[in-house]
Amino acid sequence: MAADDYFSLFGLPSKFAIDAQALEEAWRLVAARVHPDRYATASAAERRVAMQWAARANEAYRLLRDPMLRARYLCESAGIDLQTESNTAMAPAFLMQQMEWREMLDDARHDERARAALGEELEQAREAMRASLAELIDTRQDYAAAGQKVREWMFIEKLAQELAAVQP
């Protein structure tokens, strides 16, 4: 079994907008083919290779089923260094949105309606990111712009985690 990337491992096109059901079916087929139990009577080397392929299939499935991780993977595969640790530059409009969301998060600590409103806004932002990334990656192949969107989405996910940690 050979696969250059996670998409080809499952026989899927390398794109952002993927068919989730096709991904799951492909993963099940690959996982069944390389499951270590199938190699119980094989040599130690063959069992080790089967375990490595099973781990690779599981990691590929975990990454590809998450839209943000899939977008990040596609950008990095196209040679874009997201510099997630060092590059904090964002578009001015997104910076303003961040400030507004931070204020809403502060309010959410004491107000159930504010919590619900922020949760709804973040979900809408996620949907907008999905649509934008499908356009940037699948249609325009503008991986640099997509990389910027992925960094913005990472902020949204971090904020969503902070919101989830807010106690009612």
Swiss-Prot record:
It holds the Pfam family HSCB_C. GO terms for molecular function: ATPase activator activity; protein-folding chaperone binding. Disulfide bonds: none annotated. GO terms for cellular component: iron-sulfur cluster transfer complex. SUPFAM superfamilies: Chaperone J-domain, HSC20 (HSCB), C-terminal oligomerisation domain. SMART domains: DnaJ. Residues 5-77 form the J domain. The keyword DNA repair does not apply. Keywords: Chaperone. GO terms for biological process: [2Fe-2S] cluster assembly; protein complex oligomerization; protein folding. The keyword Transferase does not apply. It comes from the Bacteria. HAMAP family: HscB. Co-chaperone involved in the maturation of iron-sulfur cluster-containing proteins. Seems to help targeting proteins to be folded toward HscA. Interacts with HscA and stimulates its ATPase activity. Belongs to the HscB family. This is Co-chaperone protein HscB homolog.
